[in-house]
Design a protein with these regions (language model features):
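N-terminal Sec-dependent signal peptide, specifically the hydrophobic helical h-region
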Residues: 1-48, 144
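Proline-enriched interdomain boundary motifs that mark the N-terminal boundary
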Residues: 34-40, 148-158
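Extracellular Ig-like/FN3 beta-sandwich strand-entry sites
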Residues: 51, 124-126, 165, 217-221
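Ligand-binding face of N-terminal immunoglobulin V-set domains in extracellular IgSF glycoproteins
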Residues: 51-57, 68, 99-144
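Short edge beta-strand/loop segments characteristic of extracellular beta-sandwich folds
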Residues: 53-59, 167-173
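Core motif of extracellular immunoglobulin-like domains
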Residues: 56, 71, 129-131, 144, ...
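N-terminal V-set
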Residues: 59-101, 176-195, 223
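Extracellular/luminal immunoglobulin-like beta-sandwich modules
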Residues: 63, 124, 129-149, 221-242
């Protein structure tokens, strides 16, 4: 039998080429033959009470108007957040907490945009959502992080007799996740303050409070800043001490 330089017979090499060709065709059909369901690369963040869009689209852009589109949360029972079938929303088995708060952009479906609009976001909406097209057997996971914020309130808490300084108090209610509290002087420098007191209410929201003793400065202007880095939110209040 004819042998090639690498020691394989011509028949063996032809078989190997045929095998690789078949594998390539299968990969092309499975990956390139159907559109993919694409979600965002980063977390989607919303504040309680806001409207939010959970991004999801077909790539390449494909008309999804006639497709069944399912938005799900696997951790819920029932798991269905929004289902569109035969051009209509299916309300059977939709989770009660999402009734009247979800919608698709009907005019954008023909361009492959299957994003979900979620109105009046609740704290309980936080979680992982699945954007799923059954006919394509394709899906994408979109994670929603929900936050709650409020502006802090500063009060004159008293006098420090030992240092003749003024004690300032700061409180901010209704935060989620748990925030940090900072005191700043008129130049923006962080002041040394006592430990932050944190209380979590039955609604899951946090109340934080802090005290600081300040001395007179050129401006006598001080700031209480409350921030939560995970949701990229900051609230602050200023006070001028006479």
């Amino acid at each position: 039998m004819l042998q090639l330089k690498d020691g394989l017979s011509l028949k063996s090499q032809l078989s190997l080429v045929f095998y690789h060709t078949v594998v390539l065709l299968l990969l092309t059909q499975s990956c390139g033959g159907q559109p993919q369901v694409i979600g965002p690369l980063r977390l989607t963040v919303s504040i309680v009470g806001d409207d939010i869009i959970l991004p999801c689209h077909l790539e390449p852009a494909t008309d999804a108007a006639a497709m069944t589109i399912e938005w799900l949360r696997p951790d819920l029972d029932p798991i269905f957040v929004h289902v569109r079938h035969h051009g209509q929303e299916i309300l059977i088995n939709k989770h009660l907490s999402y009734e009247g708060r979800t919608s698709l952009f009907i005019d954008k479906l023909k361009h492959g945009d299957i994003s979900l609009k979620l109105s009046k976001v609740k704290l309980s909406d936080e979680g992982k959502y699945r954007c799923f097209i059954p006919s394509l057997d394709r899906q994408s996971i979109i994670e929603l992080v929900v936050g709650a914020v409020s502006s802090p309130v500063i009060s004159l808490a008293g006098l420090n007799k030992a240092s003749s300084g003024v004690v300032l108090g700061c409180e901010s209610k209704g935060w989620y996740p748990e925030p940090e509290v900072f005191w700043l002087d008129g130049e923006g420098n962080i002041l040394s303050a006592g430990p932050t007191e944190t209380v979590r209410g039955p609604d899951g929201l946090y109340t934080v409070s802090s005290r600081v003793t300040v001395e007179k400065t050129d401006t006598n202007r001080f700031t209480c800043r409350v921030q939560q880095q995970n949701i990229n939110q900051t609230r602050e209040t200023h006070i001028h001490v006479p």
